[in-house]
């Protein structure tokens, strides 16, 4: 949510900032803005409501010249999406700040600042920071010290980039509870919410830690200070994925590209993590075996799509590893009186590693007596990775589309590796382990086969063009896949969709079924198939139109109002992964037919970094 870009260079920074904002569009936003310090130390600002293209048009009409600047895409929290509320915010004509996060004590600070003569022109909590920084700068006459003093007064989450005309060759940044990275160039330095924003200018990054304050200045090395004010040497990391991840490579949308990348993503998630007959516990870290050997129960905490991955893992852990599992929505978990039995492992799932509620849950869990914490994450160097005892990187590469696709399947692969690792230490049948390992090796090929059905799925999607509601059904470990299918459809097509265990039809949802309510189901050939088929007959008897994705061996005939698409057979343990793909493609094509913004659906953000 929101995006920050900052640049200190020996060249004009407007283009750098603008390209950075374009690359952050996937995060979700409603306005954009930029402030640049000219060489004669004038602070010039431009803001626009809507897409980055609106800001670009304004800049085309009147460019901002200068070698130091900050820019921002805003996701409205305090105050409506207006130019007045867009970032950067200024205090007078000297100081500008951009901010991601939420300041919880902004009303108290605002009253204090107003009593001191500061005048507010917006509805945002960020303007409080601008005036607070100006007050501290007036006292200290040093921007770094002003930021240090100001952040001690802030309650809540923030990532900041600040510039001042009295020190026109530098930017000061700070972070707490919201991500911020430093881009290290040759004779120039940058700040951003996400490395993707800076890939055109550098592939070397410093991931700031919680409480860090950073000073980037022309002709000087980057200086990072911890929360205690001590100068720290932070490691510089080289970005591994290359700049191609931020391009569509000929696909119409990032989402479609990312769906079609899943064979390679699954292969990458498995690379080096399997022996001939088992998963390698060492993949989770050098301390993994010592921690896993103590595990008698697992708590999984996540949000959104990652939560659905956790729900699938609950079935796996109980069925194959013989370990009870509990799955929690992060925003609910941290406000409950949680009972933690002895020997419980705490597992977090997050694509970005910066999801605010998941991070807060991890910090809450530290004091609850878990045997250890494991982060399954896609972003190395993220807060979740740094703060967990063990990590498993999903190796999905950058995911630009707001609706998660390849990150979800790679999380499922990681969770199966966790299941096999815990199962081996808990007496799981060795031959069954070997069967699943072999099935994992063939999974990328099976996914490729499913992607070959794209045209047939696109044809099915035409039935959804005029629909306003849909119902998804699944049983067992495929109920979470139905939940994920419903989430995808509502996220990007804006069709209201719900998911239920198929056995719950008679307990309410059946009342909704008629010819205008398409019902989508997944039908793998497992022990629940016959019960599922009975549930589907109940739908047909009420005039519902069925769309069934079934194993190629399932005896289920097409008929009027019954559409069956057959998928290749896969080991039933991995069927939830395979059956995810047709639901992703169905949602994608329905959204295209509806004419929605597939990659950036309304009101949603890719990385939810505020609570």
Go through the PLM ranges and name each one.
Residues 262-266, 270-299, 380, 390-518, ...:
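Active-site phosphate/pyrophosphate-binding segments
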Residues 67-84, 275-290, 313-349, 355, ...:
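Glycine-rich oxoanion-binding loops at beta->alpha junctions
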């Amino acid at each position: 949510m929101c995006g920050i870009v900052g640049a200190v260079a020996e060249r004009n920074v407007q283009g750098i900032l603008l390209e950075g904002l374009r690359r952050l569009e996937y995060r979700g936003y409603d306005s954009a803005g930029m402030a640049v310090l000219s060489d004669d130390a004038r602070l010039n600002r431009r803001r626009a409501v809507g897409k980055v293209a609106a800001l670009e048009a304004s800049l085309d009409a009147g460019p901002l010249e200068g070698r130091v600047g900050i820019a921002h895409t805003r996701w409205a929290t305090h105050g409506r999406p207006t130019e007045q509320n867009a970032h950067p915010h200024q205090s007078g004509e000297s100081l500008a700040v951009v901010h991601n996060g939420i300041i919880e004590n902004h009303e108290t600070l605002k009253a204090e600042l107003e009593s001191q003569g500061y005048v507010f022109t917006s509805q945002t909590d960020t303007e409080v920071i601008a005036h607070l920084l100006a007050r501290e700068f007036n006292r200290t006459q040093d921007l770094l010290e002003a930021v240090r003093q100001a952040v001690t007064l802030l309650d809540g989450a923030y990532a900041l980039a600040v510039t001042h005309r009295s020190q026109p060759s530098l930017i000061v940044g700070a972070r707490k509870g919201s991500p911020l990275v430093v881009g290290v160039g040759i004779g120039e330095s940058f700040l951003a919410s996400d490395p993707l924003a800076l890939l055109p200018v550098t592939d070397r990054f410093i991931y700031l830690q919680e409480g860090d304050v950073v000073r980037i200045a022309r002709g000087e090395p980057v200086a990072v200070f911890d929360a205690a004010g001590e100068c720290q040497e932070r490691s510089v990391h080289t970005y591994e994925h290359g700049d191609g991840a931020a391009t569509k490579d000929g696909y119409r949308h990032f989402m479609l590209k990312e769906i079609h990348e899943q064979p390679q993503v699954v292969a990458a998630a498995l690379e080096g993590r399997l022996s001939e007959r088992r998963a390698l516990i060492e993949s989770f870290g050098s301390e993994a075996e010592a921690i896993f050997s103590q595990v008698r129960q697992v708590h999984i905490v996540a949000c959104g799509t990652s939560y659905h991955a956790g729900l699938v893992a609950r079935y796996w852990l109980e069925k194959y590893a013989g370990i009870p599992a509990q799955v929690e929505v992060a925003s609910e978990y941290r406000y409950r009186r949680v009972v933690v039995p002895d020997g419980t492992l705490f597992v977090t799932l997050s694509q970005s590693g910066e999801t605010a509620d998941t991070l807060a849950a991890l910090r809450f869990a530290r004091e609850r007596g878990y045997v250890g914490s494991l982060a399954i994450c896609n972003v190395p160097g993220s807060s979740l990775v740094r703060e967990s005892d063990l990590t498993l990187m999903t190796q999905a590469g950058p995911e630009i589309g707001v609706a998660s696709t390849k990150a979800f399947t790679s999380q499922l692969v990681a969770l199966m590796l966790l299941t096999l690792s815990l199962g081996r230490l808990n007496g799981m049948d060795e031959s069954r382990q070997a069967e699943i390992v072999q099935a994992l090796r063939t999974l990328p090929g099976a996914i490729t086969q499913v992607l070959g059905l794209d045209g047939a799925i696109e044809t099915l999607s035409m039935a959804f063009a005029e629909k306003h509601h849909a119902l998804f059904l699944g049983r067992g470990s495929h109920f979470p896949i139905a939940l994920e299918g419903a989430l995808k459809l509502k996220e990007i097509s804006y069709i209201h969709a719900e998911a239920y265990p198929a056995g719950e039809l008679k307990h309410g949802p059946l009342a909704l079924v008629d010819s205008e309510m398409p019902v989508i189901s997944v039908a793998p050939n497992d022990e629940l198939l016959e019960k599922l088929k009975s549930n589907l007959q109940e739908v047909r008897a009420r005039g519902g139109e069925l769309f069934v994705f079934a194993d190629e061996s399932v005896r289920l005939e097409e008929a009027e109002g019954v559409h069956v698409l057959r998928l290749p057979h896969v080991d039933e343990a991995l069927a939830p992964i395979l059956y995810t793909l047709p639901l992703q493609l169905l949602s994608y094509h329905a959204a295209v037919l509806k004419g929605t913004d597939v990659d950036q659906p309304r009101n949603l953000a890719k990385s939810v970094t505020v609570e």
